[in-house]
Amino acid sequence: NLNEKQRYSIINQLASSYRIQKDYQGLILFLTDWVEENPNDMYNSYWLLMTADAYRSTGAEPVAEYYFDRILQQCPDLLVKGTSVHFKCLQNLIQISKTPAHRIKYFNELINRFPQNVNTTELYLRLAIEYQSDNQWDQALKAYSLFLEQPDATTIQIPGEPDAYKNARHLVDFNNSSQDWTFESLPALEEAVKKAIRTYNWRQLDKYKAKVNFFTMSWKQDENDANSQEETPMASWARGKRIRYADTLDEASNPNEAYLRTWGWATYVPIFYFYFRKVDFPLNPDIHGNWEWAGIYLGNKL
């Protein structure tokens, strides 16, 4: 005839003794038997949390994931020492779950149910990346937009995502643009740019610039610097001078990026490296894999 709290105290003491001895199999057997025989115990979510933790401690992460998820689906939430059991489950699940669809569900639950306990700016970004991995591009763009709207989006340091803001900004802006400046191949882009220089057609050269996030900067600058995004017509840098270009692309070029050395510009740095980049935008198959002129690096390569 023990009341709920007395019963909780006894079960918790027994479970703790198993855990202290690192007898995880004994702990799992004891708690799963208890939950099965006492389906109405108000602390079952906590006993199953201990079960999931025990499985995780033994390296059985898929089984741990099953129990963490089962708690979310079947058990009411419970505060233990001031912490929500459901919150602890979600924290574990985003660490061990490998399936994008599941991870999407868990990130959404964390954002919607526990915004005060998490960094929503980081989670919007991680949610967007999961949607992208799952080819849910419309949802990915919505999540990227929410990330960009956060006041600390430009300054937040997110582990494993050093270019978070730049990549999100580029994707969202690219999606909202005309997307009409790309070339089907790198040789086509290279020849068009060279022809415009050769014929002094600076207006045409300006048209080849990417309409989103085109930059002009030194090799040490950051693409996101406000100064690097300022547009300057190519004619104002040419000023009637004879501009020359290398016969071939720079040796640092690779399958996704290319550099064309040009020189003779009427500016304090007469050498410009034109930066060409392969377009990574699966949302529009017509241009995905095309090439764009994405920016200009000033001066010799470092």
Protein language model regions, located:
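Short, aromatic-enriched amphipathic alpha-helices that serve as compact interaction elements
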Residues: 182-201
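Alpha-helical protein-protein interaction scaffolds
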Residues: 1-175
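Exposed beta-sheet edge and beta->alpha loop/turn motif
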Residues: 127, 131, 136-137, 242-302
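Short solvent-exposed beta->alpha transition segments
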Residues: 162-165, 187-188, 206-259, 263
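Generic structural signal for hydrophobic core residues of well-folded globular domains
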Residues: 55, 196-197, 209
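Solvent-exposed, charged amphipathic helical/linker segments at domain boundaries
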Residues: 170-187
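Hydrophobic, Leu/Ile/Phe/Ala-enriched alpha-helical segments that form helix-helix packing faces
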Residues: 71, 193-197, 234, 238
